[in-house]
């Protein structure tokens, strides 16, 4: 074994070549070698033997609403990154809303970076925002290091982040395409939403009818057409409607540069199980029926959907009323995303390698961090999650690190206990004990 400061050893290490018994050598913050399990440990190196627990690359979550500054009663960098670390996530990319100010100018980005600097327990990057009136700010934000730009095609739910109409979408895409940036889009069509029945109240079936599939499908079709027009890179956020999958496949075949994500809640929860009045299950677009979920899983398997991210979007408990029309829409999932996905994947005969591909490898590639994140390979950051995949636990909201311990998974039994999480060669959480914040702020490569 070459010189190393740390050797992390397991009978099951997930590498790009597959799962095998291995000794992972780490020097400083980087992986220097992935060697045979019984390779000799160099003098002076610290051996951490985790037995048959699985060592996987730290997850990369590219869709997180930290809400800091401005709405820290909802979340914040300290609590969000602790929750992420507890769940095996070592990198997150923060959405430009629901913070105040939103990340829509270089000055606002600077404010957010200053707030995050000493609070991040994991590595953190930032998305910019595309608004009707900030086209002039997009290139400066790109040059300042944001990973891309988020836009809404329907109202966002917060006044400081208005949505784009079709003309504004075209202007933003033209500008972003000029420097080959990435536009990530909440795709629901406002006209279809306005035409849908808006009964309100506690019945989930009424809420589901108010966010119909055709609102997603129409908005995605609009986005794909504009992406083709400008040869722009676009990414569909939190896909819920399986009806849009053929549109996406056809666009790709036609050369449109589009990637797609979905979320654990769409893959693990179903409309049929949502109790009336239980707005901890509310998100937009909504959790849909079991048959729709099956098609999302098929799309993950065949590659139509690229990756899985949390869309962690918490609020204070008082905003989660029993009226689905007025309750805040968002699911807090950072700490539970890995066990929730692993539980569902194993139930469908899929492996941890699949989960790693969707939640680490491909998310790192989405934001251009795949040269250093998303894989256990020489030259990559020494980011690891150590998982006991066959151990189970029952979700207790009191055990969550989120600022507001509201969860749609309360009382569920999940497979996969995160035993420890490592960031750039240092163990940052083990058995619920955290180090001081060690996270770095990341720029687009």
Curated annotation (Swiss-Prot):
Question: What is an annotated GO biological process for this record, any one?
Answer: purine nucleobase catabolic process
N6-carboxylysine: residues carrying this PTM: 150
- Asked whether the keyword Metal-binding is assigned, the reply is yes
What is this enzyme's catalytic activity, as reactions?
(S)-allantoin + H2O = allantoate + H(+)
Cofactor(s) this protein requires: Zn(2+)
Q: Which residues bind Zn(2+) 1?
A: 63, 65, 150, 311
For this UniProt record, the keywords arranged alphabetically read as follows: Hydrolase, Metal-binding, Purine metabolism, Zinc
One Gene Ontology cellular component annotation? Answer: cytoplasm
Give the cofactor binding note: Binds 2 Zn(2+) ions per subunit.
EC no. given is: 3.5.2.5
Question: What is the recorded post-translational modification?
Answer: Carboxylation allows a single lysine to coordinate two zinc ions.
Report the pathway entry. Answer: Nitrogen metabolism; (S)-allantoin degradation; allantoate from (S)-allantoin: step 1/1
Name one molecular function that GO assigns to this entry.
zinc ion binding
Output the InterPro entries linked to this UniProt entry. Answer: Allantoinase, Allantoinase_bact, Amidohydro-rel, DHOase/Allantoinase_Hydrolase, Metal-dep_hydrolase_composite, Metal_Hydrolase
Database matches in Gene3D superfamilies: Metal-dependent hydrolases
**Which Pfam families does the entry link to?**
Amidohydro_1
Residues the entry annotates as binding Zn(2+) 2: 150, 186, 238
Q: Which NCBIfam families match?
A: allantoinase (TIGR03178)
Record text on subunit structure and interactions: Homotetramer.
Q: What is the annotated role of this protein in its UniProt record? A: Catalyzes the conversion of allantoin (5-ureidohydantoin) to allantoic acid by hydrolytic cleavage of the five-member hydantoin ring.
Similarity comment: Belongs to the metallo-dependent hydrolases superfamily. Allantoinase family.
Protein name in UniProt: Allantoinase
Please give the organism. Streptomyces coelicolor (strain ATCC BAA-471 / A3(2) / M145)
